[in-house]
């Protein structure tokens, strides 16, 4: 079985990075027309910048508003919009589900994808995977695409203005990366490319956990007292949530933490919680299933409580024991 490292073609992160979007795309040989699948908040925040940078590069673009759910119906709507404008590249802008939709549309059309996350709430931006849900928000399946994004462009100034809870959710998603990678390594499970992780993939996954421990609380403090330039700690957490976790989970694999997340989506009570919040809970459950050393469980528990991630059923909305029972069915 081959060792496989999986990553985006190019990753670019920094303050006001959106100003360089068209330049980065041209440098990769990407040309218009461009179809931007954008969440409402991303469009509100970035449309004026897109207009400026694409005009300067002589690239036509259209914006397709994202409905809020990465469903088969939404992917079909996005594909129709992209085909109608003759798009040669898809840009997904917004949160994880908008980016998942953008990658799915690009894969169906056989054209490159660019991801521009406006929040650091998941490790979705760098991946070649789309999590598909029903229109009502129930998890259905994963789509595995032939190619990772050609470009992931992360504007840390935009992310620093996002709600703090979304960064915390991203840390919850990133938290699982090392522990799921380790579980896959121990069991010999295959990664998303039908191989096993390289040493580099495992090292990146472990580094993700170390950065969360070192910088998580400081990054939250920085978001609560914003400055003109995002702090070094916040930049490191954005990178951990987005790049390190993205490479780690695709290169090393997923385990119980994400499976538990998927099961939780059947309970309506948890729909108000973000992906990473549920994954963090699943990570603790995975460590219990593995009978991990108590000091490791305590370290993860302490991290979760220090940044505000849920650690009990009640904290993910399951106050009624009957709701917990449904998860076994």
Protein language model regions, located:
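Fold-independent oxyanion-binding glycine-rich loops
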Residues: 15-16, 38-40, 93-95, 116-119, ...
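Active-site segments that bind and position negatively charged phosphate/pyrophosphate groups
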Residues: 192-303
